[in-house]
Regions:
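Solvent-exposed, flexible loop/coil residues
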Residues: 19-21, 42, 59
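Active-site nucleophilic cysteine motif
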Residues: 14-34
Length: 119
């Protein structure tokens, strides 16, 4: 599956904690690229409170990505690489980063990325 196909497959999906949120969106792409789901042992969560607890137990998104992916300069990020903007896991795509928000997919300028990981 290409990144474009992956993003397109999420266009009509509604936000749902533990099923279609920023973490599952990024983790799903990482699994496609690496063959490993780094969230498997940490599922399920169904509420914002449960998600926050799971992330705290993991050490946070930065820790999860640092432990499992190669950190890179965000200026060197390619399509499909991972970033975190305002606490939201996102994927680089062209001039933007894309993530799942409460109202569907959200896009931000890629220059907002302060960190990145190669996927």
């Amino acid at each position: 599956m290409t990144l474009h196909e992956y993003i397109t497959s999420h266009l009509t999906k509604k936000f749902k904690w533990g099923d279609n949120d920023c973490c599952t969106f990024a983790a799903g792409w990482i699994e496609i690229k690496t063959g490993h789901d780094y969230l498997t042992e940490h599922r399920p969560w169904r509420t914002a409170k449960q998600a926050a607890r799971k992330l705290r137990d993991l050490g946070g998104l930065f820790f999860l990505f640092n432990e499992n992916l190669k950190r890179i300069n965000p200026n060197m990020a390619q399509d499909g690489d991972v970033t975190i903007i305002d606490g939201t896991a996102s994927l680089f795509s062209g001039r933007h980063v894309v993530s799942v928000g409460l109202n569907g997919l959200e896009y931000a300028d890629r220059t907002r990325a302060e960190c990145a990981w190669r996927c």
